[in-house]
């Protein structure tokens, strides 16, 4: 079993963990339908930037 040679300091541990934070998704509201969607993505209704781009 692998065992560390030297104890990692609190500083080293925290520096490693500095990249582990979660970020919230950038959610936008469509102008035409008022539906929430991810940025740069088409809504479920087929709208993108206020225009109908997909016909169902």
From Swiss-Prot:
Record key words, sorted: Ribonucleoprotein, Ribosomal protein
UniProt superkingdom: Bacteria
GO cellular component, one term: large ribosomal subunit
Keyword Amino-acid biosynthesis among record annotations: no
Biological processes annotated in GO: translation
Keyword Ribonucleoprotein annotated: yes
UniProt family annotation: Belongs to the bacterial ribosomal protein bL32 family.
UniProt-recorded name of the protein: Large ribosomal subunit protein bL32
């Amino acid at each position: 079993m692998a065992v560390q040679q030297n104890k990692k300091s609190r500083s080293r541990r925290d520096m490693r963990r500095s990249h582990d934070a979660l970020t919230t998704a950038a959610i936008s509201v469509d102008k035409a339908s008022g539906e929430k969607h991810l940025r740069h993505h088409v809504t479920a209704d087929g709208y993108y930037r206020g225009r109908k781009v997909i016909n169902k």
